Amino acid sequence: MNKPDTAIEAADVIEAEANASSTVVQQKSWKDYLTLAKTGIVTSNLITTFAGLFLAATYIGVSLSDYFLTIVWTMVGAALVMAGGCTLNNYIDRDIDHLMERTKDRPSVTGRFSGQHILWTGFVQSAAGIFFLLLTTPVAAVIGFIGLFVYVVLYSMWTKRTTTLNTIVGSISGAVPPLIGWSAIDGSLHSYAWLMFFIMFFWQPPHFLALAMKRVEEYRRAGIPMLPVVAGFEMTKRQMVIYVVALTIVSLMLYPFGIIYTTVAAILGVGWLALGIAGFKMKDDVKWARLMFVYSLNYLTILFVLMVVVHL
């Protein structure tokens, strides 16, 4: 695998940080902080956090109106923990993000923020998030910390640049939001909470591998061993289909949610599986990957919103 020129990378990063530290011409804005926090990721994960919270209240028989502050602390805490993890990820990846089209304009790359500023911003966000989760239950705070540790240390600092298993490791951290939401109400974690965790866990590989296929040359240039880079598209497609099958099975294990949920979950799963299998015949792999990526976003939103709606 071709590795990026680390000497040039280091020089670019040092120069950018020096410029950011020595001048006040470039004024920081809230938009820059939101970019570092990856608000798209945070927002989508807050949907699953709320679903966990709502379902926990439903199944232990309490009214959400009696847990107003718990809802606030949970959503704010989860958002800050996720934002902190994403900001720290920006700090860690600032030496390679300039090699990728979708990340080259991040404040961590352009020099608008110094590396030290990004690092401290991530630490403060993460600590504040854990604190707010602690105001709900210790279990929620511990789960939040575990998710943060897995994402920042095990994924960003270790496996992302060393193994194709990076996607699996990242999927663990990405699957904890429903657990955070549920444990903020009920620390015992019902089996439904764990099924929601596994839905998130199996959803992420086909989602992120589709993105990796779309951006395969960028990942190759950055030296990141994503599966499409190391094993090629055919192997990646097979892996994606396997995960979609597992996801569909797990989602249907929540059949006690009712016939409407079960029917829609089955349709969503079979539809995604059909699209996945079609990829073996499509000539345009990038177009197929784009379709898989968009489908994954719709799948997640519809499924978790539906979990809430059928319990209203």
Curated annotation (Swiss-Prot):
One of its GO terms (molecular function) is protoheme IX farnesyltransferase activity. It catalyses: heme b + (2E,6E)-farnesyl diphosphate + H2O = Fe(II)-heme o + diphosphate. Keywords: Cell membrane, Heme biosynthesis, Membrane, Transferase, Transmembrane, Transmembrane helix. GO terms for cellular component: plasma membrane. It comes from the Bacteria. The keyword Magnesium does not apply. It is found in: Cell membrane. Its main location: membrane. Signal peptide: none annotated. Gene3D superfamilies: UbiA prenyltransferase. It is an enzyme of class 2 (transferase). The chain crosses the membrane at residues 40-60, 68-88, 113-135, 139-158, 165-185, 193-213, 240-260, 262-282, 291-311. Converts heme B (protoheme IX) to heme O by substitution of the vinyl group on carbon 2 of heme B porphyrin ring with a hydroxyethyl farnesyl side group. This is Protoheme IX farnesyltransferase. It comes from Halalkalibacterium halodurans (strain ATCC BAA-125 / DSM 18197 / FERM 7344 / JCM 9153 / C-125) (Bacillus halodurans). The lineage of its organism: Bacteria, Bacillati, Bacillota, Bacilli, Bacillales. The gene is ctaB.
